[in-house]
Amino acid sequence: MTANINKLARKNIQKLNPYQSARRIGGKGDTWLNANESPISVPFKGKVKVFNRYPECQPNNLLSSYANYVGLLNNQILVTRGADEGIELLIKAFCEPGKDAIIYCPPTYDMYAINAKIANVEIKEIPTFKNTWKIDLLNIRSNLNKVKLIYICNPNNPTGNIVSQEDLKSLLKVTLGQSLVIIDEAYIEFSPKNSMVNYLKTFPNLIILRTLSKAFALAGIRCGFTLAQKEVIDILHKVISPYPISTLIADIAVQSLEKKAIDDMKNRVLKLNMNRIWLIDELKKISCVKKVFDSHANYILVEFYMFKKIFQSLWQKGIILRNQNHKNNLKNCLRISIGSKSECMRLVQELKNFI
């Protein structure tokens, strides 16, 4: 019977390799440095006590809170189940299966390509330049035929680099009237001056993805935002599910956007950025480390000698890192999430033991 059920699945789904999230991969650790989560849990108490009614499709108080945070209007924002749902909804709303295409620029977040595969939308893969990780604007411009969406992660995951605003503006200009450019700013709180939010009024083809999972330390509630001009948001309203955000999630999200909570978030970011600077300096002194890439986020990409031995040994000791060896131009690389100071110190000490 199992074989018959598999045959009922769509052909592209039968061939699909699902995204391997940190939790799906597993591991039995006590030092989790593989999912770019906050090492600090932020306590919130639910204020809402009534749950017998369905929530608003788009909780107005949450829209207002986030609009105030980013300096936009409510009708320029869509609340989603993490930024991941925003990635999916954009493909669902704008790409014709078997006809249209997306562009993405590996090494980067895999869910752009996986969502396109699920929707049977063509993927045009245009890698960034090795080591600098700059986007290949000339190659992108030459491959715009059939392309509806271009996904750029900024800061980029897993490399940690920033795509310059000049490059992004050039991309937006060349695609105006033809393609939408989606800037995934999941990690932008760690480098806020590089946000493209202020350009939403200038470029109607600009869309920005945000989340509460990283700097806001709320990965467990799955709450994200799509920012765009009203016309784009109106289209996305047509394809989002009726009740995407639960009453409890909206309640916690609103609390996280209060002034004190935002101030606390900025202080956590400051500490994590200091930990990142310290960790980069320490890693550069260790003999098994071949190269440490600069980062503007809460993680570092590191190329190792004895890559496999190091990854497995740390795993067995309960220090869980993210393997990037299989990705474009990332041979022998691991991504290290910035943890607490004690977690970073433990990692450094273990790495010093390798000869």
Curated annotation (Swiss-Prot):
EC number annotated for this UniProt entry: 2.6.1.9
Enzyme kind, highest EC tier: transferase
Subunit structure: Homodimer.
UniProt source species: Buchnera aphidicola subsp. Schizaphis graminum (strain Sg)
Family: Belongs to the class-II pyridoxal-phosphate-dependent aminotransferase family. Histidinol-phosphate aminotransferase subfamily.
Modified residues (N6-(pyridoxal phosphate)lysine): K214
GO BP: any one term: L-histidine biosynthetic process
Biochemical pathway: Amino-acid biosynthesis; L-histidine biosynthesis; L-histidine from 5-phospho-alpha-D-ribose 1-diphosphate: step 7/9
GO molecular function: histidinol-phosphate transaminase activity; pyridoxal phosphate binding
Protein name, as recorded: Histidinol-phosphate aminotransferase
